[in-house]
Amino acid sequence: SNIIKKILIFHQDMFYYKFNFILPNTKWVGTKACKFKNFKNPQWLRNVKDRKYKFYRLDTLFSETKYQSIEVKKNGGWHFTNIKTAEDIKHKLHSYLHHNEFEKSSLDIEDIQDIISNQKTIYNLKADKRVYKIGEGEKLEKIEVSHLPNYIKNNELKYKKWIQE
């Protein structure tokens, strides 16, 4: 009820493979929220652009994806992706929307394990969408468990497989 803007976008730290492998200088902006009265459908919310537009941008008055009434939560939480084994990541990428790109890469489980061991992302999020981006991406950094959500900190033994020493 204290949400004033039409759309909320959460800037979240991005983590790969292990709970404490962070992708520095990159924020996940895929987590969005709105009041139920403004909600159209899930795809509409996914398509909303992650930036505020100036009041004089007339195209925002007619756009389904560009809005002036956006609030960005700068410290919006954590986004964990591919917290999986190399085998499970391969299965996920074969099932993924862009599986053709993954299949062209000819990465096998050992290659994926090497990418994880070398603390790199499996694809380059900043690559031009028209070019090949699967393979070794950006370098991940290990952070201390103290920076993670309380639930993970309080259950560190339970999740030790997913926390890099």
List each model region and its residues.
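Nucleotidyltransferase catalytic core that binds NTPs
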Residues: S1-N2, E144
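C-terminal accessory extensions appended to soluble enzyme cores
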Residues: T65, S69-E165
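Conserved catalytic core of nucleotide-sugar-dependent glycosyltransferases
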Residues: N2-L107, Q113
